[in-house]
Curated annotation (Swiss-Prot):
This is Glycine--tRNA ligase beta subunit. InterPro entries: DALR_anticod-bd, Gly-tRNA-synth_bsu, Gly-tRNA-synth_heterodimer. It comes from Pseudomonas fluorescens (strain ATCC BAA-477 / NRRL B-23932 / Pf-5). The keyword Aminoacyl-tRNA synthetase applies. Belongs to the class-II aminoacyl-tRNA synthetase family.
Length: 684
């Protein structure tokens, strides 16, 4: 079967840069889906995207759809005709389903059967519908119309190229008649560009100053930016999302170095970086110490004969932005950070929970409660908590919301606050996402935990639980943040106490009954997903969860111990024994016996197990007290042999009630040893 390369390019006005990659991938996926549905084979697929175009290249696409056969079985003959040979409703219904007369149905076999051979269509006749369907299915939240046309798309369309081999596909899509003429760079080559063949698409456009391959543009920008940064004795800050956005803004990228006045470096560099990245799409430069250099890199969409004009233009544009940041910084410093706190009395945190000022006071008290329990200073944590939200009322944060916490840090230092108190104002928001940085100070950790617990308790306390994908107060992220800080920073905080303190701080604003348990359940449930991501079996998590440890660090240490235990050869058998013992003890009416008396032993294996349990108990008590859980379980693994011998030789449910109770007590002691670490019966 013959095959040809297929190219489709839709030309438009400038597409939304942040959506360009998504649109391109969806365009390719839609075309691929259409080709597969039509049974059309091909060799490879490529997608290209630039500010004014979306294109897909399919290599070695079959030029003819294969023939196909339809074979449908109907009702049995005896059900299809009555005794007189007249067709029943079953037969007539089958014919109607097939879209033919009953006479066209094969009646020779045990069942009615309809067979049809469908001849394949030329690929060229199928492509317009495939392309149009793909464009209609693009994830475009809001489509627009232009001129007096009825067609809708994300931006007005300007041209359409559709080639199968050397032939133009005759069609009109989104008000554009297909041809072989594309367009070059808006300034360098504004005239049309003839695409000589699908395989020459990239080369033909490159000659017209258009790099249609986004990956090529991205690599060029990244490489050239790094080279220019090195020449400036610096390192460029190139966030992946900013690089993608800049790549989507230019067809012929030309990175250039610009500068700004050094006086602006007195402003917190985070504010300067934020405005240059978010508003101007610039790449900022840092020196070897991580300090901002008074230079930046812009990516022009033109190869100018006089690049100095472009450089000066960008320097002129950025100056008012930096001047604004400088003004806000100076204005805010005219008063102490603490003075902004009163303004927060008029800023609502949550209607039922009070103002942001109220929240800061609660955070202050809770942070002071937490700090000494994780090795910190209560007074400093209280101070940091009180100042934690002050910068929300500053002009800097009002203009640059991303500066919350960061602005507070600089203003606190300006006021002479201790370094760890100042740092805590920024670290309270950590971690800002999955895998993000954690607080570096104990004071910061205490405030971060307090802030998150206060939000969790407050929102749960008014019944606004997260549901499905809706989590407006980011409670899941808050819970995971608390867990990450405690586990990864190795802080042994009893969350039972901390959550109870947080509940009491709200007073009558929340429904306190059962609230602490609800919040704790939610927090520790987040560990399940965390461990699953780390490859920890859910049974391991559940074995520890059954004990309800209050410390996240302790919880994690137990999980790691159970993970190690499960690799031991004795693990499976001991888990099964614990399951058996658990089932036996659960059937006892009343309290489980606790007294073991050797006089009721009537089998040597009972003596052996009792002796082994006593020895193990003595050995593991100091281990468990020191939280050496792996060592504890490894030592208990030695009980497998006497346990197996006991169950082989001893009938637990003896007829004599005292003997039976004695054996229950022995098994309860055995199970209690393991429960010092986890309920390993869950592993069976």
């Amino acid at each position: 079967m013959s095959a040809q390369d297929f190219l489709v390019e839709l030309g438009t006005e400038e597409l939304p840069p942040k959506a360009l990659n998504t649109l391109a991938e969806a365009f390719l996926a839609g075309i691929e889906k259409g080709l597969q549905s039509a049974g059309l084979s091909f060799q490879a697929k490529h997608v290209y995207a630039a500010p004014r175009r979306l294109a897909v290249l399919i290599t070695q696409l079959a030029t003819q759809q294969p023939d196909r056969s339809i074979n449908l079985d109907g009702p049995p003959r005896q059900a299809a005709f009555d005794a007189e040979g007249n067709p029943t409703q079953a037969a007539l219904g089958f014919a109607k389903k097939c879209g033919v007369e009953l006479s066209e149905i094969d009646q020779s076999g045990p069942k009615l059967r309809y067979s049809q051979s469908i001849k394949g269509k030329p690929t060229a006749s199928l492509l317009p519908t495939i392309v149009e369907d793909s464009l209609n299915d693009l994830p475009i939240p809001k489509r627009m119309r232009w001129a007096a046309r009825k067609e809708e798309f994300v931006r007005p369309t300007q041209w359409l190229v559709m080639l199968l081999g050397d032939e133009v596909i005759d069609c009109t899509i989104l008000a554009q008649k297909a041809g072989r003429d594309s367009r070059g760079h808006r300034f360098h080559h504004p005239q049309s560009v003839r695409i000589t063949a699908p395989a020459n698409y990239l080369a033909d456009l490159r000659a017209a100053y258009v790099l249609a391959d986004a990956n090529e543009r991205r690599e060029l920008i990244s490489k050239r930016t790094a080279e220019l940064a090195t020449l400036q004795e610096g390192t460029a800050i190139v966030p992946a999302d900013l690089l993608d956005e800049v790549t989507a803004l230019v067809e012929w990228p030309v990175p250039l170095v610009c500068s700004f006045e050094e006086r602006f470096l007195e402003v917190p560099q985070e504010a300067l970086i934020t405005t240059m990245q978010d508003n101007q799409k610039y790449f900022c430069l840092l020196d070897v110490d991580g300090k901002l250099l008074p230079r930046f890199i812009t990516v022009a969409n033109i190869e100018s004969k006089d690049p100095r004009q472009i450089i000066e233009g960008n320097e002129k544009v950025v100056r008012p932005r930096l001047t604004d940041a400088e003004f806000f910084f100076k204005q805010d410093k005219k008063q102490k950070l603490e003075d902004f706190n009163l303004r927060l009395q008029n800023v609502v945190f949550q209607e039922k929970l009070g103002s942001v000022y109220d929240k800061a006071e609660r955070i202050s008290k809770l942070a002071a409660f937490i700090a000494p329990r994780i090795g910190g200073d209560a007074q400093r944590a209280a101070r940091a908590g009180l100042l934690s939200k002050c910068d929300l009322a500053t002009e800097m944060v009002g203009e640059f919301p991303e500066m919350q916490g960061i602005a507070g840090y600089y203003y606190a230092l300006n006021d002479g606050e201790p370094e760890d108190v100042a740092l805590a104002l920024n670290e309270q928001y950590m971690p800002r996402g999955a895998g993000a940085e954690l607080p570096s100070t104990v004071t910061g950790a205490a405030v971060a935990i307090a802030d998150k617990l206060d939000t969790l308790v407050g929102i749960f306390g008014i019944g606004m639980l997260p549901t499905g994908s809706k989590d407006p107060y980011a409670l899941r992220r808050a819970a995971l943040g608390v867990l990450r800080i405690l586990i990864e920073k190795k802080f042994d905080l009893d969350l039972n106490d901390a959550v109870a303190f947080a509940v009491s701080a709200f007073g009558s604003k929340v429904k306190a009954a059962g609230l602490a348990d609800q919040v704790l359940e939610f927090i520790f449930d987040r560990l399940r997903a965390r461990y699953e991501d780390e490859g920890v079996d859910v049974a391991t998590y559940l074995s520890v969860r059954a004990l309800k440890p209050g410390s996240a660090l302790d919880f994690d240490q137990r999980v790691q111990a159970v993970q190690a235990f499960r690799k031991l050869p004795e693990a499976a058998a001991l888990a099964a024994v614990n399951k058996r013992v658990s089932n036996l003890l659960s059937k006892i009416e009343g309290n489980v016996p606790t007294t073991i008396e050797a006089k009721y032993f009537d089998n040597a294996n009972e003596f052996s197990l009792y002796s082994a349990i006593q020895q193990a108990d003595q050995a593991v008590q100091p281990m468990a007290a020191a939280r050496q859980y792996s060592e504890t379980l490894a030592r208990l693994a030695a009980l497998r042999e006497p346990v197996d011998a006991f169950f082989e030789a001893v009938m637990v449910n003896a007829e004599d009630a005292k003997v039976r109770a004695n054996r229950y007590a022995l098994l309860a002691r055995l199970r209690g040893l393991f429960l010092g670490v986890a309920d390993i019966s869950v592993l069976s």
